[in-house]
Amino acid sequence: DVLVEQYLPQTFWIEGQVPEDFEENNLDIGIDIFKSFGYEDEEKVCTIDVPVKVRNVVLNPLDESKFFLDLWQHPSCLARMYKVELWSDIHFEIVDNYLKELASLGEKVATVIVSDYPWAGQSCYKVYKNPSNLYEYNMVSVSKGLDGKIKCNFESMDRYISIADKYKMAKEIDLFGLLGNWCAGEFGNPVEGYKDPIRVRYFDEKDKVFKFINNTNDLKEYIGLVLNHLIECGLWDRVRIIADEPNNPEVVKECIEFINSTVGTHQVKYKSATHDQNFLDRAKDEIDDMSINLKLTIQNYKDIESLKKKINDKGGILTWFVCCFPEKPNSFLSSPFVENRIIGWYTYYFGLDGFLRWDYNLWTEDPWKDSSYKF
């Protein structure tokens, strides 16, 4: 129900689907208007006839759409939300349900997390209004053998990718946690001498305790194991190493050289969600796929076409995104639905390939009580 004040015009949204075999040029919709007062019977006031012009175009189902929808998934959060063991069979049943729904919307990317806390829990440790655990954990089970060598169990990562493949939503496989990790200063960086705060927890079989990789030799060995596993699985052409909102092009270039050294002659493809003009100007040659926030999209509107051509010519995708800003348009709980509706229209207007959003299924501690976070 909507409260409509007297004498004020009221808009309302009506959504439906025209059958594919509809052959007419026009469709007439009749909208019946009723009124009632208190406990009186409803009374029909009028019928509003709305003529609709029907274009001779059949849209593909969303899961077959060329629109590049890139909503980042948070599988660890699902285990917490439903109070099940991380990477257990029941956890993957829940993951399956969520990915099936996401795929029906036209999702094109599988989020694969290969280190611990790449976003440092979205700084949830600083939020007191609605305290929530928003940490994401490594899909790879890591250990160090008695011989001092790093070992990896890829079962959970492979299983996640397999589910995404089942629903045809892994056109791209984005690896989070290897580049552009957050909060090196306040959340810490365990790897001595490495400028990107990669946090990889492992079980030391010799000391029988959990530790974090703290040197570049072990880090290089670990990254090499992850990337070579994906190469051996025949997935390499779909893999991107993604950096979320990097702002230091020198550090990114240095880390890219380090990562490249772990896979020999294989070409590594990189992607960034970019919100920094300096990074956009100075690092776009190193990036194969890119998403730029709405502010940068508008600021660089005159150059968008050439940037898109540069990215597309490398076989990449150029999208745009919103995050915790701007206030409008966005997809907050408080955002009017029409702001979500215009995402596709904006994408068409800007001439971009699609849209990115970072917070699919990132539930607060008790979403039934308060599903809003920070805002």
Regions found by a protein language model. Give the residues of each.
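Aromatic-lined carbohydrate-binding surfaces of glycoside hydrolases
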Residues: 17-20, 27-37, 46-265, 273-284, ...
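N-terminal functional module detector in eukaryotic proteins
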Residues: 8, 18, 314-317
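Surface-exposed binding patches on compact interaction domains or structured appendages
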Residues: 1-13
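Residue-level signal for glycine
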Residues: 42-44
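Substrate-binding groove of N-acetylhexosamine-processing glycoside hydrolases
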Residues: 230-243, 251-375
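Coil-to-beta-strand transition motifs
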Residues: 9, 24-26
